[in-house]
Amino acid sequence: MFRALFALFLTLAVAGSAAAQGQAINGTIEGTVTDESGGVLPGVTVTVTNTDTGDTRVAVTNESGIYRAMLLPLGGYRVSAELAGFKKYEQVGITLGAGQVAVINVKLGVGAVSEVVSVTADTPVVDLGKIEQGRTLNEREIKSLPLTSRNPYNFALLQPGVVGFETQEFGVPRLTANGALLRVNYQIDGNDNTQKDRAGLRQMPMSEVMIREVKVVTTGYAPEFGQTMGMVYNAITPSGTNAVHGQASYRLQRKPFAAFPFFTANRATKPPTDVNVFTIDAGGPIVRDRTHYFAGFENSRRDFSGGRVITISQPNAAALGLNEPAYMPSAGDTKFAIGKVDHQLSQAHRLSVRYIFFDNFISNNLGNPGITSVQRASDFTDRQHSTAGQVVSTFGNNILNEMRVQYATRSQGRVPGSQAGTGPAINVAGAASFGGPIAGAADAGFGFTENIFQVLDNVTYISGDHAFKVGFSGQFVKDTRTQTQFQLYTFPNVASFLAARSGANPFGYSNFQQFFGEPSYEYNTNMWAFFVQDDWRLSSDFKLLYGLRHDIYAPPDGVQNALVESSRGFERDANNWQPRAGFVWTLGQDRRTVLRGNTGLMYDQPLNAIYEQAIVNDGSTRRGAVTLQPAQAGAPAFPNVLAGGTAAASNTAWTVDPDFQIARMWQSNVQLERGIGELYSAALGLSYTRGYDLPVVTNTNLINPIGTLPDGRAIWSTAINANTRRDPRFNAIFATQSIAESDYKALTLQFTRRFHRGIQWDLAYTLGKSEDNAPITSTLSVQGDTGGRSDQADLEVDRGPHILDQRHTFIGSIVAQPQLDLSGVGGAILNNNQFGIALQFASGIPVNVRANRDLNNDGIVNSDRPNGVARNSLNLPARYNVDLRYSRLFPIARTFKAEVIAELKNVFNTVQWNGVNSVVTVDALGNPAAPIPSEGDMFPATGGYEQRQFQLGFRVTF
């Protein structure tokens, strides 16, 4: 009923699908000019001036009295309006943010043009031109909110409808919006910054130094934006102005500043948590009112040991012969640099060029080791470059063109850590992972290079009440990989491993995996997009945005002689048409209430790992992949491995289903927002999304099950022949299929205060529910369901909450910079103080209870659940986190200030779980040997979020 009523409402309201973040890195000022009686005034000259840089745009009102100034640089603005016979109107104090449509309505009084009516006011507290769901974190928030991680991507979690968890350094936070698991279109200045191989990965990390604003849109984005079913995260880099500004800072953390990490087995020694961060940046004019520069640099050196707790139990460590430290010793050295120039080529053409550099080294880079030994850790290097340019051109008063070009490259690799083990890697289910450091495709020996060239051009034509926009973009991606030569034994329990090690039973393992052959390969992918949209202001109270987007994905070439036919060539997905529409309706005479609605179809970006796996695991003698169970022919006796280069050893292949389609999601949203006075607003929103064609990996080679488990799951034969395998040349053929679905419903409540007298806040609550039958593996995603599908015959067995489903979330950001009208000692003490508070209260993420053995003989370990246990049926405890930043300013000269900064992560040191060891011992039918815990926190913890951390900083600004 909810779904039907929601769809009916939006269909009647807008007859289409969603959006209106019409500009990626710019903003729009628009409005209606009337006389004192309310009659519209055509022919009014409206001049829009950027008070920071001197840029000027002139618009003329049409027959409906409407004017539009689009593709404006961010910053402060002055709007003036002139018409013969009327007094001149001038308004200052307008601040324009990324993607914002600032509605400035003007009322002209009769009189001489020489008479000036001056107004100082910002846009209305309720955004009358906004259609999409999302928010902009402005420069004040970016610089004032606590961020001990130095990772601005964590700010996405301060957006209503976004769930997941942050990272403690420059890694990738796990983010989900609209129930679209880990689907994020990362952008820098509107240019693509999304890594193409797996879901949830950004390419270039960002530093606070490199960001002016963050624009987060969760749904309702215009046809101009695509290649995601989730959210758009757009980081806007700073620009110089006519005034020279800059800063230099130093921040530090030390061991005494931090509490003990959560779930530490040995609390005798606190781990090192040293952090040293140096930053410097400056911006200003090269030629006043015409050419401006910005440059910045950061070097962050951090000891990660305190966040990397090893939780192998003492009895298991002793039995396995492991001597593990309490913490994974790990340290990083990270450098950022940015340079940017903005130049007004002429009155009609503006150029912006920027370059970003990133370099990173982390020793023993294993983010949350849990039961993983230091033997398995590897050292990680990562270097990136991004160069981009934008040209904005105006032709007369009604045609604008925006062109963007970008070239970005990322190169990373891993080598064994200083304490790496030798021999094959070993996993003992639920106990420990140790041995050699090469257990998977991304371990030691892994190499990755991705180059992206992007070109984009958009043309806007303003005609009457319409702003038509058409555009295209092309992305050309080249990937080069070096595949690890991994060797991995998996055992069901400690006793089985000990028996194998002693020689009593060298075949007591669950399975053995190995890869050998040519390690390096490369492939190319191309993506094209076309869109057309109309931003139609039907009246001063109602605006409709509708349009159509088309994405075309050209996958890599197949493997010409692949043994699996479907891997010889991959189908091009070219039918991705996406209708979208949205509206904003201003209600009431006081213009303080707006109703927004949007609905539309969004397509995902292609996950290149889908094709990559088929290329590298083609089943040929050129590259060999093997998965063997002990009873199968050719299975080695522990600890032996297979001799490389033998054709008989290659018994595992990957492919892409010939009917594979790019995933898509239909999103619908409605929001009612009400302004309360001049400072406050409250909003109520409802969302519903439905995902289709979600990717899952299936072993399609299994046929003729030999039995069932008590709960009905099929059991397969371990024999490999024509009666048990569709293609008896292989034990397993893993095909990526687009057969899964998702469902998401949410209610959001939001209460905001705009910045006034030194205080602003944004508070929000989301009640959401996400379900799917798409257990995505870490092969395709940065955060995956361990093992993937648990039943290769029935996908509905895996329907349940997805891995980042959080039913309740409350988030808040508060910035306070009070300035009191006091002099003397009182004024000196109470003024020049700044506070930033970030709040995150959320339900715990799901826990998937897993069996310690392969119950159905599908060759996939750690994916099966005990008999009768549903997927993700338990949850971790709720998370309550408060971060605080306090700084004290010391004015030295008119434009020179010193600042002392104190930041606290997890102020109250509340215990925060991020993972448990949920593997339970079962018999051959999946019956547990002991009662299964009824709560997620009854399992042994494998790690937590950050304990209380204190960071001290010093900064000078000018």
Stretches found by the model and what they are:
Residues 121, 248-254, 295-299, 353-357, ...:
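Transmembrane beta-barrel strands of outer-membrane/channel proteins
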Residues 152, 165, 558-578, 582-737, ...:
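Solvent-exposed loop/turn elements at secondary-structure boundaries
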Residues 208, 274, 539-541, 555, ...:
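Short, solvent-exposed micro-motifs at the edges of structured domains
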Residues 223-226, 240-245, 287-290, 348, ...:
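Short loop/turn motifs that connect adjacent beta-strands in outer-membrane beta-barrel proteins
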Residues 245, 271-361, 379-408, 579:
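Transmembrane beta-barrel wall of Gram-negative outer-membrane proteins
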